[in-house]
UniProtKB/Swiss-Prot annotation:
It comes from Penicillium rubens (strain ATCC 28089 / DSM 1075 / NRRL 1951 / Wisconsin 54-1255). This is Cytochrome P450 monooxygenase xilC. Its cofactor is heme. The keyword Oxidoreductase applies. Belongs to the cytochrome P450 family. Keywords: Heme, Iron, Metal-binding, Monooxygenase, Oxidoreductase. GO terms for molecular function: heme binding; iron ion binding; monooxygenase activity; oxidoreductase activity, acting on paired donors, with incorporation or reduction of molecular oxygen. It is an enzyme of class 1 (oxidoreductase). Disulfide bonds: none annotated. The gene is xilC. GO terms for biological process: mycotoxin biosynthetic process.
Amino acid sequence: MSRLEIALSSTPEHLLKHLLLGTVLLTSLYALYRRLLPKPLPGIPFNQKSAQSIWGDVLELRDDPSGLAKWCSKQLENHGSPICQALMGPLSKPVVLVADVGNAREMLMGRSDFDRSAYIIDRFPLFGEFHLNMKTGDNWRQSRNWLKDLLAPQYLHNVAGPAIHSSVLKLIELWQHKFHVGDGRVFSMVSDLKTLALDVIVAFHFGSDFQDSALDRQIDHVGKLDGSKLPSGEYNEVEFSKAPLHEFQQGLTDVGDKMAAIYTTKWPPLLVAWWVRYVSPYYRPFFEAKDRFIRKHINLAVRRCRSDEDPSTGIDYMVHREEKAARKARREPVFDKQIMVDEAYGNLIAGQHTTSAALVWILKLLADYPSVQEKLREELQGIFDSAMQENRLPTAAEIIKSKLPYLDAVLEETLRLRAAMLVPRDAAKDTELLGHRIPKGTVVLLVCQGPDYKPSPPSKYWSDVKASRMYPGKGNPDLEIFDPERWLVRNEKGDLEFDGSSYPQLAFGLGIRSCWGRRLAMVEMRIMTTLMILKFELKDVPKGLRGHEASYDISYRAKKGFLHLKSRGEFP
């Protein structure tokens, strides 16, 4: 008889049962542990240490102060590879990270293999049935169809352009007030540019049906302030209080900020959004009121449409499009459906939040690079010579129709450096990317400012896909440097031209899921930058207020946005 048999025969039966039960329990726990461990995709680099933890990379990502976008960039750099994967914890699929190299962006954004990512959709439930939050399908096509006329030259020139120009002139007036009340001291521009974008996007949609200007309220408020009683910050920057907004505009601003917070929350986004939408005593009344407000304006547009009046507002154009589509399909229009309300509401939120972030970066970079600012001013003064002779600022039509290659290069370079950081896509079917199998449903993040922005790739693994960036001009080879020259070329006649087609930035995405509002945003940036550079000199601000630290939510948003203005005084 073996020692084991002797030991077992002398062991009480109840102890044997406990021993057996313990063995089964430990085996089950180990099996559960193995089941909960991340399952990396074969062949794609990953963190070996993270693969041995059921939490994968989640804890490291959570504790990284630089945020998701920078963390993704560091993973690619650490692996020395243009593709790697992040392990996202128990029972979650890996997320594939891809550097913006070779044909990766075209593969991700130009092929039907990849679609709008659930990663984004799940983080913006407060958008409701807005097209941004839909997979590509019939509802998405219907919603996008309503917006087609808002991209037409007639709308851009006759409706959008004048509305933007009028709002920027109000912003200039506001900043002149702040300059005088604050005795020329530095002040923050962030809130004012959000107010500009808010006024503009509301004017796009409602036109003369809504005449309560947020900028007018700020102008009246600042004009009544006593500069000697205004508080100052650490660097003697002046701090201005804000006027209350119309309740609808205040709600749009607050919900936009809350969406940005939900994007980065550590709580389940759907749970937080549910609480905001249905429970919060502050936000719940807005969601109820905004539906009534937007429906009222849709009904006004329907009455105008059926009275054969020409469309004059963004809502008018949407209603005309839906009326035509319903007639063609022999169905009832959906004017009373939530999908149309949410489309208008979503555009109001997204339009003011993302554009204002870009406007801040434009003025920050021009202040940081005075030689670029002066060169831009020289171009504008030359092109708008007749306006200069008449001692006036150029009109919206003059700005929109003029060829301004250096201005276009400044805007393109700003968007390249300070816009998209991550572009998420979902694999719509089993596919391949950079030679690796990508299963259906996998989230892929295109990392737009990864290690490929550095002059020297960190590893031989880049060699097969690391082609030189096809920027047309002769800009600085360091892609982290702001240099508009990389977008400028000379034509056969020797004239300077802007060429943004060779390697387009991803601020508005690519392919059919690109941002529909790109043209509107570019017109707004063009008009704002032109008028500001002609009216003001953007001077340097104290070092402690200069930083380019940013947060990444709906957009890439500067944490510091300060202005030190000098009025040029040429214009009334």
